[in-house]
Amino acid sequence: MRRSLNVFVLVVAFCSTTAFAQDGYFANWFERSDRSKADQPHWVTPVATVTPRLEQEVRYDQQWQHNAEGVTTDNYDGGKGLELIPFHNVEVIFNVPPYIDHNNPKVKNGFGDTSFLVKYRLLSGNEEHGNYILTAFLGWSVPTGSYTNGAKHAVITPTIAYGKGFGKFDAQGTFGVGMPIADTTKIGRTYTWNNAFQYHVIRKLWPEVEINSTFYQDGPHDGMKQTFITPGLLLGRFQLSRRVGMTFGGGFQIAATHYHGTNHNGIFTIRFPF
């Protein structure tokens, strides 16, 4: 945990020093972020898959996860939060710890872990210049969860994200590896592979299907695989003001593998890009 906090402090300190060294950094914030967003495709962020695009928004998710005993766990916020574009080709995400209500008197409710994500856009072209994107992520979580609602150690997650559009159709995906900083053989590594396939039916209607897979190495689920098929629908972007918009939607996760911790899970998501 201390190592993760030190890394985060160093990143913030570096960004702050660089920022204040530039005249008009904050005065030019929206001009800079708008220019960054103009250089990439204008798809919407999928329901579950993290988009390779750079976004600047506030996001809230709500999840309902059903286990084999028929008990529903309510996940408030889903670990989402504030997304900013502080530099060209760079996005920083500060995620609020989710609050987890197990609806089970034998399991204590509480907040999950705090997490952060940095995106660096490697390649991109908007709809007039190829309609594609390739982005590298570095995510890390800090074990701030109460009781058993978080991990025992910090987890570092490098990820590669990609996307390509073909007219009104687009595909976005990520492949990442979650690596605990300690007790790796006991906790295990996770390999997550997510792909979303969207079709822009009309101006503000985006139906989609996602395939969300997790592969486990070491730990209690060694050798297992969990895959969900997630049909979803997104509506937006609706302009609330000259600067602020709104996109919302939801999805329904259906387990497609023999092993699955939950099934028939509901997801609601709302975002306010600015």
Give the location of each predicted region:
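Cleavable N-terminal export/targeting peptides
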Residues: 1-30
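Transmembrane beta-barrel domains of Gram-negative outer membranes and organellar outer membranes
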Residues: 21-274
